[in-house]
Amino acid sequence: MQSTGWFHWGRTILRAAGLFAFIAFAGSTFAAGPTVSNVRSGQRPGTQLVDIDYDLADPDSATLTVSVVVSNDGGATYTVPATTFAGAVGGGVTPGRGKRITWNAGLDWPNKFSVNVRFRVTASDDLVPLAPGGMALIPAGSFQMGDSFNDTPEGWGERPVHTVFVSAFYMDKYEVTKALWDEVKGWSGGNGYGFGNPGLGKAANHPVHSMNWYDVVKWCNARSQKEGRVPAYYTDAALTQVYKTGEVAAYVKWDAGYRLPTEAEWEKAARGGASGHRFPWSDADTITHSRANYNSNSGYPYDVSATRGYHPTFNDGVYPYTSPVGHFAPNGYGLYDMAGNVWEWCWDWRGEYSSGSQTDPRGPGSGSYRVYRGGSWDYGAFGCRTAYRYDGYPSYGNIFLGFRSVLPPGQ
């Protein structure tokens, strides 16, 4: 369950000793979920620090996840790049009165002035079971989605940067391996499933590749049913006919079994809980062969690898030059190979970004191309950026393209 509270600034802000009035709005309430209320705020005199106070109640959870987004147009959009928060924010926040979040507005949004600033404070339950084996919990929360470095020209689809709230979910720590693919596919053959592509892999512990989007979706259903879970994909809007054969734009039961991540889920997971970084790691905004399996070249200033071309460890003269999953260090959420190795299919049709804030976006309702993310062993550093978007026909598969699956809490 989730609840939201709002706060509105009524006067110019971010002057060093500015004062301002405000109006507080009660948040939405849910009988069985968390409640955010009595949201109020004040700028500390002589500073550009802003204290956001609120009350937090919840009938059934010891801890909650709290997120904040900021608008400078009266709440029409929440696109202020606010990420430097401290205090009662993030995971593990206990219910109570007088909770305080401090925003370093001077760092995130220097030398800005507005008469229409509004905060949105959101709380969601932390009552999420431990992650299943081989998966990592991606906690609920907001992040800035898109290219904040302006690495791409306008029109490339990575901007505008916008605030997205994503509910909690589990994600495979590793790209699906050839061994796991074969295990599930072997089971599926006697249970009514049909695949257009067998799925290939350099070795059992390397990522599977060369499956199209439809086969990946059907495989997710087979994995769910093999483990006794309710499948996620169906051929009818009533969600009664499990998708097992053919090529269809499936309907989704979002609270059911294994499925592909949405673009927003994938990017939030890839960022590893950090904000404002180019790659899945947070200690540098550069990439080298010590970080990922990709095709290095000097054409990108953020590619500072001492070795160029294909990764020297995996360039053995036999295509594809994939690496064993988990060879490189994980990101902040414990996910491996979120940059390089193989591209990863996502759920979404390719579409343009909105400037407004969003909650659990799932992309356009139709389209021609499905998105994939993350770069590959054959692609340059440009494609390994967390904001980079690539796409292809859903009937398309190749030696550069694999996937990993996600699972909703409670499954």
Each PLM stretch: what is its role?
Residues R15-A26:
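Bacterial N-terminal signal peptides
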Residues A31-P45:
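Short, compositionally biased P/S/T/A/G/V-rich stretches that sit at domain boundaries
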Residues Q48-I52:
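Structural beta-strand segments of beta-rich domains
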Residues D55-D60, N72:
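Extracellular acidic, Ser/Thr/Pro-rich low-complexity tracts
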Residues D60, L127-G192, H209-Q225, A264, ...:
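A short glycine-rich, aromatic-capped structural motif
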Residues W109-N116:
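Short glycine/proline/serine/threonine-rich loop/turn segments at secondary-structure transition edges
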Residues V121-A123, N398-Q411:
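Short, structured beta-strand segments at or near domain termini in extracellular proteins/domains
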Residues I138, Q144, F149, W213-Y390, ...:
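Functional-site microenvironments in short loops/helix caps that host divalent-cation chemistry
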